[in-house]
Amino acid sequence: MKRIVLSEGKRDVFLVEQFFERIGRNVEIDTFHASEVAKGEVKGQETRKIQNFMERRNPYDLLVKSEGGKPDLKRIFTKLIRSLSAREMGFVLLIDLDNRPLSALFDELNQKVRGNYDGNEYGIEMTEKIGEDTDIIAAEALFFAVDDSTTSSFDVLAFKKDLEHAAGIPSPDDTDEERINELLTEYSSVRRQMEAVLL
């Protein structure tokens, strides 16, 4: 089954790519970086990328998108969740909690998705915490219509603080890929939670 991973930034995309390389799975990965597209062209290019990815002849198994930061990720997630959940594919939200509880993220997303679809009531709730370690939480969530006509599950990988803290990257401008790779050693907690969600 095809899957889409929505994430905050380029480092998150790199993390997912390296994860599959490290575990030796033959997964064809396509990427999309919103920060590399002119502001007025993001929506059109994003729509084309998703439509192309969903085509039967498309060779990719996984589309990993970076949205250019948490505010844009939350906004785009709440706009796309309805259309993406109607398709037969897996869906993963990769996000930083910035030391907030996971429940606060779900409360915020639930409030945003309810406000995005006038005339229909939708919601988001966590259904199961799959795993939790020092730096990351893996969870399963549900997008639903209040009238029970639509339900779709999706997964969440949430860094308790952020990816940079977990990897020991001292500066937001540092592009230390080696430190991100160290998060994916065979017995690391981050790798275990990623395996629980992505495999």
List each language-model region with its residue ranges.
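Short hydrophobic beta-strand that contains or immediately precedes a catalytic carboxylate
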Residues: 5-8
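Mature soluble extracellular domains of secreted precursor proteins
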Residues: 30-38
